[in-house]
Amino acid sequence: MAIYKVFFQDDKSEVIVRENTHTIYVEGNSEEEVRKYLKNRDYNIEFITKLEGAHLEYEQQSEDYKVEHIQ
């Protein structure tokens, strides 16, 4: 399992605007699995990145760091 950071907009019908970008963290086996997990949400996914090493450690220090686990 790995931790993925997902950048998204709240509404699929809206044009992507950087200032409206939100993030969530999802634990999964692959980017594809994370996309399948999120497909029923009305998210306009911009980008998904796998977090590892120092980058993951940095993100874990954020008060907004909460991981959703795929079941």
UniProtKB/Swiss-Prot annotation:
The keyword Transferase applies. RNAP is composed of a core of 2 alpha, a beta and a beta' subunit. The core is associated with a delta subunit, and at least one of epsilon or omega. When a sigma factor is associated with the core the holoenzyme is formed, which can initiate transcription. GO terms for molecular function: DNA binding; DNA-directed RNA polymerase activity. GO terms for biological process: DNA-templated transcription. Keywords: DNA-directed RNA polymerase, Nucleotidyltransferase, Transcription, Transferase. It comes from Staphylococcus carnosus (strain TM300). InterPro entries: RpoY (IPR009907). Belongs to the RNA polymerase subunit epsilon family. This is DNA-directed RNA polymerase subunit epsilon. A non-essential component of RNA polymerase (RNAP).
